[in-house]
Amino acid sequence: MSADKFSEIFSGLEEAYGTYEIQKQQVNGKQSGQASVLRSPRTAQTWEGHLSGKGPAIGIIPINADNNCKWGCIDIDQYTGFNHKELLDKIVEMKLPLVVCRSKSGGAHVFLFSKDWISAKILQDTLTSISAALGYAGSEIFPKQIKLQLDRGDVGNFLNLPYYNHEESLRYAFKADGSAATLEEFFGLYEAAVQTVEQI
């Protein structure tokens, strides 16, 4: 099932996850809303509700209790008129194994995926270097933490996931030609880009 595959790709902290309800759009194009952290595991219904749009949009904390991740993201916060195709062309030119998704506000979420769990510090360092190489130094990097203090209630920061209400979603991945990828096409983009721990 699509929800199972999607949840496997976006594995993260099991103990908590985020939800986000959009309330209005600001002048700069960024959408504002109510973010919440739920300190409970996700269920199959949580994932299915995200993809169908019948439940809340969810966000995942990429770093797990062992301080490892299976994905990370460069969050490029440029909203109005952002040129995703230009970014895609640069990624292709540099032969980087990345998947670009449109964020909820029209910016870009640039994902690096790992087949297995990898140290949050290694992934964060790699994405920081890639961000600078792409010309977006200073962009927010997920995972934001390299170590969680779960015993102190620290669950880290979540990233809003793509493909909310996937059949009508504006939070889609981009194909190489700049067109929107369906959820099934996203799975193909993931398979083409996912790296081993050694490659990262």
Language model features with spans:
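Short, solvent-exposed beta-strand edge segments and adjacent coil->beta transition regions
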Residues: 69-73, 107-109
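Histidine-centered divalent-metal-coordination microenvironment in nucleic-acid enzymes
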Residues: 98-123, 149-162
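DNA replication initiation on ssDNA origins
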Residues: 1-71, 81-89, 157-158, 163-166, ...
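Short, charged/polar micro-motifs that form catalytic or ligand-binding hotspots
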Residues: 64, 76-81, 109-117
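Active-site-adjacent loop/helix surface patches within enzyme catalytic domains
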Residues: 73-76, 84-102
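Helical (often loop-to-helix) elements that flank the catalytic cores of nucleotide-handling enzymes
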Residues: 83-93, 113-140, 167-187
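Short beta-strand
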Residues: 61-63, 98-105, 140-144
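Short secondary-structure junctions
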Residues: 17-21, 96-100, 138-139
